[in-house]
Amino acid sequence: MSQGVEFNRLMLDMRAMQADAMSLPKATAAPELAEGQSSFADMLGQAIGKVHQTQQASTQLANAFEIGKSGVDLTDVMIASQKASVSMQALTQVRNKLVQAYQDIMQMPV
């Protein structure tokens, strides 16, 4: 007889858990962006493109200086090189923070 009572209690508990689960708000998809707004992925892509452009400009300026093109100063070459270096370091730090945030989220208990 006690098995019947335990079974009924188990069924009541399961129904209560089901009702609790049904009353929880549903997970929603990412909100739609308003017109004119860009997503984080777009901003990151633009930043990567800008770093690439900075590095290309630095390389072109250095090559022009090496072949002795007139109007190219060593100071301009060094400044362009440092700009490219700093932008790459900043992008690397952003990448490191993204990886760390991803790892933190993945280690969260569910």
Curated annotation (Swiss-Prot):
The keyword NAD does not apply. Keywords: Bacterial flagellum. It comes from the Bacteria. It is found in: Bacterial flagellum basal body. The keyword Ribonucleoprotein does not apply. GO terms for biological process: bacterial-type flagellum-dependent cell motility. GO terms for cellular component: bacterial-type flagellum basal body. Transmembrane segments: none annotated. GO terms for molecular function: cytoskeletal motor activity; structural molecule activity. Belongs to the FliE family. This is Flagellar hook-basal body complex protein FliE. The lineage of its organism: Bacteria, Pseudomonadati, Pseudomonadota, Gammaproteobacteria, Pseudomonadales.
